[in-house]
Amino acid sequence: MAKATTIKEALSRWEEKTGQKPSDAREIKLYAQIPPIEKMDASLSTLANCEKLSLSTNCIEKIANLNGLKNLRILSLGRNNIKNLNGLEAVGDTLEELWISYNFIEKLKGIHVMRKLKILYISNNLVKDWAEFVKLAELPCLEDLVFVGNPLEEKHSAEGNWIEEATKRVPKLKKLDGTPVIKEDEEEES
């Protein structure tokens, strides 16, 4: 089997392709590397100016080494093998969007550190309990959530009460699974 691509190798390919220095760049795309990236290694800490980092469609198992990314606002980790949200604390004060759909996340422990998070795409993961879902209510800025394809959503959508139950538990949401949320008091006023 081919050896995994390291972040360092992916960055040097990216630099060759774009002609930009990774340490200066605001947006870096390292998605779908062949062979795939398996580890978020220490080379990431050189990306001091990066605001948007895409590592989607690789084989990453753990979120790590984000401490040098002082300006990171958008992190794309969709279609990897990530099982939990540990490692996000390093970007808890800056991250506004986390795209982490199509992984193996069951528990949302550690999400509370994301104090600026506005957008969370966490569809097609393994979250099955309300006890995990309610942790999203701890995010003071969260307004757009895509949660479709998690066992919890599938069960309640089949019962016809998903949007009602989800927005009751995370009342600040403005958009759920791509649909604008209309609050009952807004309905009564119209």
Swiss-Prot record:
The modification N-acetylalanine is found at A2. SUPFAM superfamilies: L domain-like. One of its GO terms (molecular function) is alpha-tubulin binding. InterPro entries: Leu-rich_rpt (IPR001611), Leu-rich_rpt_4 (IPR025875), LRR_dom_sf (IPR032675). Its main location: cytoplasm. The modification Phosphoserine is found at S56. Pfam families: LRR_4. Keywords: Acetylation, Cell projection, Cytoplasm, Cytoskeleton, Dynein, Leucine-rich repeat, Microtubule, Motor protein, Phosphoprotein, Repeat. One of its GO terms (biological process) is outer dynein arm assembly. Signal peptide: none annotated. LRR repeats lie at residues 47-69, 70-93, 95-114, 115-138. GO terms for cellular component: cell projection; cytoplasm; dynein complex; microtubule. It is found in: Cytoplasm, Cytoskeleton, Cilium axoneme. Outer (ODAs) and inner (IDAs) dynein arms contain the molecular motors that generate the force to move cilia by ATP-dependent reactions. There are two mechanosensory systems that monitor and respond to the mechanical state (curvature) of the axoneme. One system involves the central pair microtubule complex and radial spokes and the second system involves the outer dynein arms. Part of the multisubunit axonemal ATPase complexes that generate the force for cilia motility and govern beat frequency. Component of the outer arm dynein (ODA). May be involved in a mechanosensory feedback mechanism controlling ODA activity based on external conformational cues by tethering the outer arm dynein heavy chain (DNAH5) to the microtubule within the axoneme. Important for ciliary function in the airways and for the function of the cilia that produce the nodal flow essential for the determination of the left-right asymmetry. Interacts with ZMYND10 (via C-terminus). Interacts with DNAH5, a outer arm dynein heavy chain. Interacts with tubulin located within the A-tubule of the outer doublets in a ATP-independent manner. Belongs to the dynein light chain LC1-type family. This is Dynein axonemal light chain 1. It comes from Rattus norvegicus. The gene is Dnal1.
